[in-house]
Amino acid sequence: MLVKTYCAAVNGLEVTTVTVEVSLNTGVMYHLTGLGDEAVKESRNRIAAAMQYSGYKFPIADITINLAPANLRKEGSSFDLPLAIGILGANGNIPEDHLKEYMMVGELSLDGTLQPIKGALPIAIKARSEHYKGLIVPEQNAREAAVVNNLEVYGMKKLFDVIQFLGDKSSPTPTIVDTRKEFYENQVHCDYDYADVKGQENVKRALEVAAAGGHNLIMVGPPGSGKSMMAKRLPSILPPLTLSESLETTQIHSIAGKLGKNVSLIAQRPFRAPHHTISQVALVGGGTSPQPGEISLAHNGVLFCDELPEFNKTTLEVLRQPLEDRHINISRAKYAIDYPCSFMFVASMNPCPCGYYGDPTHHCVCTPGQIQRYMNKISGPLLDRIDIQCEISPVPFKDISKAAPGEPSARIRERVIRAREIQAERFKDFKGIHCNAQMTERMIHQFAEPTEEGINLLRMAMEKLSLSARAYNRILKVARTIADLAGSQQIEPQHLAEAIGYRTLDRGDWAERGHF
């Protein structure tokens, strides 16, 4: 007897429907075909034990199972449930009637308990697009999958519960989630606020410009000047996620198994801050069983690298292509995966090995050669991709002792949102372009063309600072954002002057300046 059940294989954000074909004949052999990995091959023992604890015997027969399409690699234990149901169906324990109506995924414990799986949300989206009536998942994944509308999602605790449901012996209620309500209720404000930051108005301004245009930013300053503190407050001034951005971000975290307990939608922009000892694979993704890296987990949010020169130089260099293309293609012998990674890159660093170069209150013990070698840990091509380079001075006592709080994040966020609305209108006819940082060269010529006076100012800056062509484009993008914040359609010389001031690390005299 031949029975078919349906499940899914996740490859990056791409989901493929997998048909589980089970045939029982006379004999005692067990054959599993279809490029399953070790976890799939080991499923036989889990399924046999789960059946026994559920009150069913594993059939003594020649069992042949094929996972179609056979040329697609299947990985993980989420195939346990469809395999078990297929075997039970072929053995006559479950009627075939409903099997074609449902997609199902889940790992089985030896006692028949369904364990949570990764990627429930993208699988649910695939099930809806393939017009399945419903999706059967472990109970812990039900709310995550139920975010997808027009699909019945059933969260099950045990294999026995699934058997009863498919055999019309029980009528469980599908899990229902009001997606929009869930999304807006979870849009809580950030715990940090720029009102807590005393002084550093120039840095707050740089962060505001970065948030308004989606620009990458690096802060350079001595220890204790507030670099990390201000970076952690950046999400408080970013525009809120849209529902489509939330779904895309949640899918990535779902695939990585990083969704928190009872979290069905990520409604806040991610803020990822990996340690400087992170490996290349952990940063960009991949591995034996491919997983999204930190750059993809930061998609639609912020990737913050504190103490940037302490990162391995080869690890930092792999950021160059993702920063430019906003997606990462990982190609290995057994797979090729593409993950989105459109994030704001924010970094901080000390100005020298001891940390006090240019600090008027501390003596720097580093030689010019040591300082230059330290700065050279950040390559020119990587710096070119950072739109805003901001120097931070220590906060003087008179600013620290002020009783009055700084400008609150809510007020800064209002200006950022207004600037983003201008950009949304500007790029409404351009697919995949949402902010000034994403402009192509053609768009720069169309939307960020300076005046004649501005061109002369740029020419002087290019010659004096020896800026690259990429830095030239970055200046125009930042100037366009500054003009948007000012509500100006035309990029004025003062907007360009401020943008040029954010290219401080492009200057070759860092080790000779002696001050910020």
Question: PLM features: residue spans?
Answer:
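Basic, amphipathic alpha-helical bundle interface domains used for macromolecular binding and assembly
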Residues: 33-44, 59, 66-76, 290, ...
